[in-house]
């Protein structure tokens, strides 16, 4: 089983479909999505519809991004929906639903949004949307840090695990590799790319809204993978 982590999507359905269809994912593999499925891009509704379909075919886990949090809050508070429209590119999302009435959004989409996680952890990695406070245990992290805080000068987390996140757009459209921290927000929704990273090998795949497709390697994960293979072959 391999783990594939998908970065920020922002309504870019063509990018998402292209990257997943060209990545060698099998039914035994695990998919983790780091959040920001909606806003900016042309088809937020289509993205959520597609994710609901994908989770029927694969083992999927979904993190909450700041855009999903704002989406949920906008259903409850008038001031939140005004801010969502004013600063968060909500119009693109509502246009994809073909309505300006938030209550017309399918209940299955609200259920999907309500079930999103704040963090995911396994033996080697911690997955969050935004970032972590380096000296704070995972269970004690503030939700604002996990969902909203920008990645400025990331430091190793006290757990010793590698942190994989999105949220802070990489304007060169390539994943950020700090060794202890990997950011795979490659600016989807602003003429960037959706990134899918295999944590087992360090290989990543990217696609954009023109259905262009490319791949690369995160060197820190690739070195670790090669070292593990060498040890395995020696034994």
Enumerate the predicted regions with their spans.
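Residue-level marker for buried hydrophobic side chains located in beta-strands
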Residues: 5, 31-33, 62-63, 126, ...
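His/acidic metal-ligating clusters that form di-metal
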Residues: 105-133, 138-173
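Divalent metal-coordination and catalytic microenvironments
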Residues: 8, 36, 51, 65-66, ...
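Acidic, His/Gly-rich catalytic cores of divalent-metal-dependent hydrolytic chemistry
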Residues: 155-235
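N-terminal active-site segment of His-dependent metallophosphoesterases
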Residues: 1-48
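Beta-strand-turn-beta hairpins that frame and shape the catalytic cleft
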Residues: 1-4, 120-126, 178
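Active-site neighborhood of divalent metal-dependent phosphoester bond hydrolases
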Residues: 40-48, 52-118, 149
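Active-site environment of divalent metal-dependent phosphoester hydrolases
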Residues: 10-14, 39-42, 69-72, 134-135, ...
């Amino acid at each position: 089983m391999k783990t594939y982590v998908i970065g920020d999507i922002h309504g870019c359905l063509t990018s998402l479909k292209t990257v997943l269809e060209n990545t060698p994912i099998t039914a035994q593999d695990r998919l983790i999505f780091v959040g920001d499925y909606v806003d900016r891009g042309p088809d937020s509704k289509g993205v959520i519809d597609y994710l609901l379909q994908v989770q029927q075919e694969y083992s999927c886990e979904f993190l909450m991004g700041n855009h999903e949090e704002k989406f949920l809050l906008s259903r409850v508070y008038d001031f939140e929906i005004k801010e969502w429209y004013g600063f968060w590119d909500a119009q693109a999302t509502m246009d994809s639903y073909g309505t300006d009435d938030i209550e017309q959004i399918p209940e299955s989409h609200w259920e999907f949004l309500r079930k999103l996680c704040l963090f995911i952890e396994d033996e080697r990695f911690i997955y969050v949307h935004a970032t972590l406070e380096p000296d704070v245990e995972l269970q004690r992290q503030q939700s604002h840090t996990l969902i909203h805080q920008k990645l400025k000068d990331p430091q190793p987390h006290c757990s010793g695990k590698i942190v994989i996140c999105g949220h802070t757009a990489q304007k060169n459209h390539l994943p950020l590799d700090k060794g202890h921290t990997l950011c795979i927000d490659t600016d989807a929704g602003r003429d960037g790319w959706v990134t899918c990273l295999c944590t087992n090998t360090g290989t990543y795949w990217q696609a954009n809204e023109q259905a262009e497709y490319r791949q690369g390697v995160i060197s820190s994960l690739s070195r670790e993978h090669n070292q593990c293979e060498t040890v395995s072959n020696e034994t």
